[in-house]
Swiss-Prot record:
Disulfide bridges in this chain: none
Function according to Swiss-Prot or TrEMBL: Plays an important role in DNA replication, recombination and repair. Binds to ssDNA and to an array of partner proteins to recruit them to their sites of action during DNA metabolism.
Stored InterPro entries: NA-bd_OB-fold, Primosome_PriB/ssb, ssDNA-bd
Keyword field contains DNA repair: yes
Species per Swiss-Prot/TrEMBL record: Staphylococcus aureus (strain MRSA252)
Motif, Important for interaction with partner proteins: chain positions: 151-156
Gene: ssb
Protein name: Single-stranded DNA-binding protein
Start and end residues of each SSB domain: 1-104
GO cellular component: nucleoid
SUPFAM superfamilies linked to this entry: Nucleic acid-binding proteins
Any single GO BP term: DNA replication
Compositional bias (Low complexity): 112-128
Length: 156
């Protein structure tokens, strides 16, 4: 039997860290994972998958990941159930993570946004041709008609 789940997605909220009665740290979060196909409107839908992680990895997740962080999760699928206050049986399916990869540095979303803003400010008011770089000559500019190539001239 095999129960293995590998996911890559973005956190939809900050992780929640708590400690069990026996003193074990547990972090939980939801991962948004894009589907590989588009719907009838041409939009890509996402699945929102609950993740739990234990012990030291739970501490690291809480410390280094936040809403919007890109993460890779390797774990197993688990379904548990409990009885709620109304006496109804509630089933919960989640991924119990064995390993979590932080796929971008903390606050990289902010850094990428800052870099984009700097680029916009630097190029604002400039034409794409006024960057004072020499334009490379087109070696085929004066070619009249098709260019003849021999197979022996190709590097592959």
């Amino acid at each position: 039997m095999l129960n293995r789940t590998i996911l890559v997605g973005r956190l939809t909220r900050d992780p929640e860290l708590r400690t069990t009665q026996s003193g074990v740290n547990v972090a939980s979060f939801t991962l948004a994972v894009n589907r590989t196909f588009t719907n009838a409107q041409g939009e890509r839908e996402a699945d929102f998958i609950n993740i739990i992680v234990f012990k030291k990895q739970a501490e690291n997740v809480n410390k280094y990941l936040s809403k919007g962080s890109l993460a890779g999760v390797d774990g197993r699928l688990q379904t548990r159930n409990y009885e709620n206050k109304e006496g109804q049986r509630v089933y919960v399916t989640e991924v119990v993570a064995d390993s979590i990869q932080f796929l971008e540095p903390k606050n990289s979303n902010d850094t990428q946004q800052d870099l984009y803003q700097q680029q916009v400010q630097q190029t604002r008011g400039q034409s794409q041709y006024s960057n004072n770089k020499p334009v490379k000559d087109n070696p085929f500019a004066n070619a009249n008609g098709p260019i003849e190539l021999n197979d022996d001239d190709l590097p592959f």
